[in-house]
């Protein structure tokens, strides 16, 4: 296929974290087919985030109704890549008669795609973002694209330095922080995940890190998690000065706040993956389930900026870690240049 100004539809229409993990693949797509128009179909809660991605040209919300067909039909797409195939989306792409329809070779939905890649993602043999990159590289084979550029490193979501500096100073003033000390965000919410770190262990991490330096601790949360955040604050207020961020229903607000922190500590949730896309230093806590490993759901920040801990399975309700060993590793990461 000649590489004209191709119109490419990419689909990841579910959660924030899942969408974030397609960003390296989409960057590779844009860098190798620079004249393409990339349109991204996303869920409503991801729309604001997708619109911040400079390599995505247009964003369409999956309305899940008959109007979606008309909205997509007008583009005349040459290519569609569904990073997660569902029967509804597969049928829609087939109905649109898009010449190249590519998806993972899984489930019944694969019957609607004329190009498929067998991946077996549940085996967790590589990071999710690499499975996504593999799909894009499969497209390059299909269109006979050679001389593929090496994948760019993060950040995949960007703010210019002046904006971050201004936002950081505003944040420090709003929350009365020490401007000379690093800002550490802790996000105790699990976002619906089965297990997360206990509030006691989040508290132990704060108290342990405070022994190294007088860090600024901020509890980050969504609107739904405000009470959990306040419970954490109450549990450690006597030992550590810690503040709860004002929660709002806004991805842009979350993005702006996370962009100013020096480290983000959380379970495998959407906010952790946003921090990774911003190339922040991240500390993630993962269950020991095969389909939820730290390798599979690795953040997309640079290697030297990420640290992960896997559940030692000492507690059926919470992820358990060796606090003393973990503290030393976390302190080493935050003190690195």
What is the predicted function of each stretch?
Residues 1-337:
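Catalytic machinery of carbohydrate-active enzymes
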